[in-house]
Amino acid sequence: MADFEARVKEIIVEQLGVDPAEVVTGASFVNDLGADSLDTVELVMAFEEKFGIEIPDEEAEKIQTVGSAIDYVKTHVRK
């Protein structure tokens, strides 16, 4: 399968309109990348659509950094 990290970062850049250099593993969507609550919901929806997964609300709330998004996708996408 394609490199999940690169694909997740690409989605974040597209959704948030941020510089790719800012999208590092430890970056917080809200604190570092300037996302608001609507942006984070849209990010989760984009991950669901692009990777064909369903992210329950309680899990979505835990996805707050680039790294946590990558880890979630890697764990839940069928190989």
Swiss-Prot record:
Span of domain Carrier: 2-77
GO cellular component: cytosol; membrane
SMART domains: PKS_PP (SM00823)
InterPro entries: ACP, ACP-like_sf, PKS_PP-bd, PP-bd_ACP, Ppantetheine_attach_site
Keyword check for Nucleotide-binding: no
Modified residues (O-(pantetheine 4'-phosphoryl)serine): S37
Pathway terms, separated by semicolons: Lipid metabolism; fatty acid biosynthesis
Keyword Magnesium on entry: no
GO biological process: lipid A biosynthetic process
Keyword annotations: Cytoplasm, Fatty acid biosynthesis, Fatty acid metabolism, Lipid biosynthesis, Lipid metabolism, Phosphopantetheine, Phosphoprotein
Main localization category: cytoplasm
Source organism, top-level taxon: Bacteria
Post-translational modification: 4'-phosphopantetheine is transferred from CoA to a specific serine of apo-ACP by AcpS. This modification is essential for activity because fatty acids are bound in thioester linkage to the sulfhydryl of the prosthetic group.
NCBIfam families: acyl_carrier, PRK00982.1-2, PRK00982.1-3, PRK00982.1-4, PRK00982.1-5
Family of the protein in this entry: Belongs to the acyl carrier protein (ACP) family.
Protein name stated in the entry: Acyl carrier protein
Organism classification: Bacteria, Pseudomonadati, Elusimicrobiota, Endomicrobiia, Endomicrobiales
